[in-house]
Structures are given as C-alpha cells and as structure tokens.
Amino acid sequence: MEQSFMQSAMAMGAQSKKGFSRSIAVERKNLITVCRFSVKTLLEKYTAEPIDDSSEEFINFAAILEHILSHRFKGSGSWFDGQRSFWDFIRLACSKVPNNCISSIENMENINSSRAKGRAWLRVALMEKRLSEYIATALRDSRTTRRFYDEGAIMLREEATVLTGMLIGLGAIDFSFCLKGEALDGKSEAVIDYTPYLKFTQSYDYLSDDEDGQSVDSSNSDDSVEHPYIPLVTDEESWRNKCRKMEQRFKIVNAQKGYLEELVRLRESQLKNVEMENKKLTAGLEELQQQSQKEKRELENIILELQEQLTSLIPGESHPLSKDLSIPLVNQWPSLQNYNNQEDSKLYHRGSFPSPEPHISLTTGSQRTERKQNGKSWCTAEKDYTPSMLGLCGSMSSLPSCKSLPSLRSTECLVNISAEPSPALTPS
C-alpha cells in the first residue's frame, strides 16, 4: 500500500516536473516569436524615420525585451539588496564592452532603481546601435550568466543566440529617446500587448521563416487562421500588392546594407588611423633609440678623454712642482756682483769681526726649500752678482745685518768667489 502510494507520488512529481519544464519551454518559444514579430514591425514602419518613446511598437518591443532578459532571473541574494533586475547582470557582464555606457547610466541622478537603470540602458544601447553587441558580450560570460539565471532561462539556451541575430537589424533604425520620462520610473511593470500578433499572417517578403506564421498563445485555437502557403495569384491587384511588399522589403534590406557598409567604412578608417599612429610611434621609438645610442657614444668618448687626462696628470705631478719651486730659489738667491777680484774665497768665522757677529739670515721658506731639495745646494748663483745681494754679502758690518745675528744657526759660512760657475754660498 505504502509502496504504491510512493510510486504514485513519484509519478505525479515527475509529471508535474515535466509539465513545469514544458510550460517554461512554451514561454520561452512565445517570447522569442513575439520578439521576432516586433523587430519586423519596427523595420517595416520606421526605417525612414526615427523612433521615440511615443511609438507603440517600440513600447511593446521594450516590454518584450525586458521580459526576455528577466526570464527565469534569480531574486535578490539577501534582504537588504532590494529587488534586483536584469540590470545587475548587464552591469557586470557588459563591463568589458569597449566604450560602454555602464558608468554613464550608473551616474545618472534621476534614475535610482535597478529596473529604471535597465530601461535606460536599453534605450541608450539602441541609440548607440550596439544592443546586439552588448547582449552577445554578456552571453560569452557564461559564469556570470549562470550566476544570475536559473535553469531553463532564455539567456542559458540556444534561443539567446537567435535573439542576438534578430537584434542586429535594429542598427538600420534611428532611435531618439528622452532619459527623463515616466517610462524610466521603474515602478510600473512592463506589459506585453499580444493583440497585434495573435493573427499574424506570413507576408510575401518573409517566405523563408516557417515560425513567423504561427500565433503566440492561441496557435492551436479555433480563432487563429493558419497560412502555411501563399496561393498563386493572377489578378493585377494581387501582383501590385506583392510588388509593393517586395519593394518595401528591398528598402529595408538596402537600409541594412547601407548601415553595414557605413560600419565597415568606419572600422576601416579606425584601422588606418591606428596603423598610422603605430607607424609614427615606431618611427619615434627608433629615433629615440638612435639618439640614445649617439648620446651614449658621446658620453663614452668624454669618459675616455677624462681618463686619459687623469693618467697623464698623475705620473707627472712632481715635475711642475719642482719647476715652480726652483724659480723662487733663483730669484731669492741671485748672482752677486764681482766686488773683489783679488780674493777667490774667504772664510768667515764668528770671532773674526770686530763688530757684532755678522751672519746670513735664512728664512723659513728657504729652509723648507732646502729640505725639499734633498741635500742639494740651497743657493746657486753664477759669477755675475747682482746688486740686490750687496746688502747681504758686502755690508756684513752694517746694523741691520747685525740685528739678525740671533737667527743664524750655523757657526760659519763659506763664500766662494771664482771664475767658475760654482755655488756662491755654501754652508761649511
């Protein structure tokens, strides 16, 4: 008994699960079909003129697309997050779209709720003619998509790829919206009007679409009229209608073709600009490299010259010093005049003069020079003596020379006066 009850319960659960999945599949198919009808209506009526918020076809299309993006959407994660909408998914999944409008919509002051931001994004994407690009980019982020949608959602099925293909044709239409209207308040629910599509018949210019002739909710009802095939018409009025519809279809395709050609030209111009900029940057980089190499070589040459100068100065440092020191020694001890030709040499002792002891004072500089000469003669002079030394050598008994006697350290001095160029005064 209990076993049969459990089996029946499991069977009922399986049937309810199948019924639930079937209802989700029907809902998914109906939304995609209605979206296809809505896009076709927009392309047929508004190819030559822009669309604004007052268009009923656009209001219905916006409601359909909002239902598609909200199909099987998960609720808020916690109680303080508030009611989430598809904008939370778009904000994360479309952040990688180049030059996107996500940050602009986030910074709008008059739009606060998540639903209002989603509606504003839908209008901005249509005005940018990039709605299909946004949705295609969001679908590539499968991890984020599974995070925001439950199993069976349109965004997780192959119908999402069909949706992006349908939305490409909207690039041929010019949209103009005001982002401060009542439609962006986010308080009212988006309601789809199915009445224009309940008895939608297949037109002559969409013969290849098999699903377009089916109705949405009442496809199996008695009121719906099916038109699987178009009968062959021969009257003139029917041919005119067919020609008129084909002409309208041609205008739509031509407008789409013009839009795609313009898009291709834009991308080609952008590519050329990028290539030119790349060439300029490459040339500038090469020029900078050449300039840096030139400056490097110049700096290396300067370093080599400085090194040569240093190596030439360091070994010959003592030669200019000896030259500079020899000049003041010669000037300080010039040659004495020949004031006595009879005597060749005289030896002066401290006690040989009746006057106070004469001496020859040596300055500290001369003593230092004597030390630097390493034992060489500290006074060199030739035979031709100058009068500047007469006061030092000829007036030994004068008073100024006597006053400088205490500074004399040596006891005797030898003055050689001869014809040979020998030192004039050497200490004995």
Swiss-Prot record:
The keyword rRNA-binding does not apply. Residues 349-375 are annotated as: Disordered. Residues 237-314 form a coiled coil. Keywords: Coiled coil. One of its GO terms (biological process) is positive regulation of cGMP-mediated signaling. InterPro entries: Run_dom, Run_dom_sf, RUNDC3A_B. The keyword Coiled coil applies. Belongs to the RUNDC3 family. This is RUN domain-containing protein 3A. It comes from Danio rerio. The gene is rundc3a.
